[in-house]
Amino acid sequence: DFKSGSTVCSDEEFANQQAHFQRFKAAVIYTPGDNEWTDCHRANNGSYDPLERLAALRQRFYTPGRSLGQNPLAVQNQSSQMPLYAGYIENQRWLHQEVMFATLHIVGSNNNLESRHLAAAAEFFARDAANVAWIEATFEQARARNAKAVVLAYTRRWPLMPLAYSCRSPRRCSIWPSTKRARCTKA
């Protein structure tokens, strides 16, 4: 989250945060949090339409093929790698020192699964499918490029709660998307 859950979701706030990210001398990888869009319907956030704020985030913070920052990193975006998921520019991946990194758009505030708005529920299910496809494609890409590890980054605190119970420390765990099971080994 680049803003608190009780501050306004204005274009001005988005512009200020983008300018902040662009001041970093290194590359900046940004994945949206719930405060930036799903919580924007709240009165103290400005009573915005969350889906409109999501569209504004995608337009302002993402450029195909590169990260933010003064020395942007070359990235792959799901929107350009997987035409079926052309709307998901925020899902990014890159290889660094034999480690495959990928961002997933999974946020708090119930991940925008809102029963009071059909459009929000439809957005959730479409984005969830995109995230699953991106995880699977990332592991395929990691295998093809002989990556030694995969790191998945997202902002929601506990989206894989069942995994937390099956993998107790000190262990290293891998998620195999095709079977949706975790494989854990002692660290």
Where would I find each of the regions flagged by the language model?
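N-terminal active-site segment of His-dependent metallophosphoesterases
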Residues: D1-E12
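Short amphipathic alpha-helical segments
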Residues: C9, R42-A43, A164-Y165
